[in-house]
Each structure stands twice: as structure tokens, then as C-alpha cells.
Amino acid sequence: MTQQEMKKIAAQAALQFVKPDTIIGVGSGSTVNCFIDALASIKDEIKGAVAASKASEDQLRAMGIEVFNANEVAGLDVYIDGADEITPQGAMIKGGGAALTREKIVSSLAKQFICMVDSSKQVDVLGSSFPLPVEVIPMARSYVARQLVALGGSPEYREGVVTDNGNVILDVHNFNIYEPLKMEHTINNIAGVVTNGIFAQRYANIIIVGTAEGAKIIK
């Protein structure tokens, strides 16, 4: 079974957490694309969605699903997204698609974070197989890079990428993260950092793993 097929299995299983007559939070990325495709089958049962990226907004609208601004809602029942890496405790690295800041904002509005992954994204230690994205205000890029080196990482400027917020991304390689919550706060305290791709403060409440045997749900 291909990775794409496993993503579709996880995305289909996530529909069970969507309650009728609610506005849901939707992330971004390849697994979320599969979820939005699946969501179209029950679009008449929900009020709409708040999207974490322009790309997801466009896809939702193309499916005929109403898109709300984050400032229009007081809270969300669920936020549904993928991850680049996830631990058994629900801590994640996200931001491969450069939408990490908006993903943090929308996920913070939700009572529950539902994370959809295929089995290749499961790790014991964050940073083991995927670099950590850090969104940075452009003028602070070099300063932030030096601070990340001091923390033990190897930052690389993601050339040609500008976030939906007009900022740049540094991808931090060779960076095993043994204390995700502490490191999330440490990096966010560097002047010029908008946010980083560690999701430990807002961890996943439910993990859906797409496998060849079907969807495995971890609560």
C-alpha cells in the first residue's frame, strides 16, 4: 500500500470526529488535502471551516464549503491536521508546508486536535527524521540562525519560500528534541522568531494512523 493510500485511510477515518452543525478547524498539507476531499461528502452537515492556509481555503471553497475567518469564531470543536513527525505522547513537528503559525493559531481555538498521519510519521524523538521549521521575520534571519546554532541545530534558509504572513523559514537539521515543550518555548523566545514547528503546548489529543490494515486510532 502506498503512502498516499494510507493518508486517505486516515483522512476518511477523521470524518467520525466531525459533528453536525459545527465549524471545524482545518490545517494544511497533503493529508489535509485528502481530508478536504473526504469532507466534501458531508459538507451539507457542517456550517463550514476555518482554514490554516490560503491553499486549504481555496480547496474548501472549491468543494463548496464555507470558509470563516479565525476572528469570526469564539472557539472550535475540533481541529484536523497532519504532521511531519509525531510522538506517542502527541507532540509534533509541523510546518513542512510553511503554514505553521496559522496552524498554531487555528489549533489553539479548538477543544480537540485530531492528527492524521501514515505510519512513517511516527517517531520516539522529534527531529529524528524531519528538520524543524522556524518562521522568522526577514530582518532577523541571520541573528536567529546564530541562536539556533547555539542551541545545537544546523539551520538552513528555505530559499524562495515566503509564508502567508510574509516571513521566511529556517529549517533546523540535526536537532533531536528530547524536551519538546521546553524547546518550543526556548525557540519562541528568540527575538525575531514568529513561532516554530514544535507542537507540544498544543499537542494532538487523538492520533489517527493510516495503515495497510486500516485506520488505527490512538487517544
UniProtKB/Swiss-Prot annotation:
Gene Ontology MF terms: ribose-5-phosphate isomerase activity
GO CC annotation: cytosol
Signal peptide range in chain numbering: none
Swiss-Prot/TrEMBL catalytic activity: aldehydo-D-ribose 5-phosphate = D-ribulose 5-phosphate
Pathway annotation from the record: Carbohydrate degradation; pentose phosphate pathway; D-ribose 5-phosphate from D-ribulose 5-phosphate (non-oxidative stage): step 1/1
Protein residues bound to substrate: 28-31, 81-84, 94-97, 121
Entry keyword Metal-binding: no
Role description: Catalyzes the reversible conversion of ribose-5-phosphate to ribulose 5-phosphate.
Subunit structure: Homodimer.
NCBIfam families recorded: PRK00702.1, rpiA
Name by which UniProt lists this protein: Ribose-5-phosphate isomerase A
Biological source species: Haemophilus ducreyi (strain 35000HP / ATCC 700724)
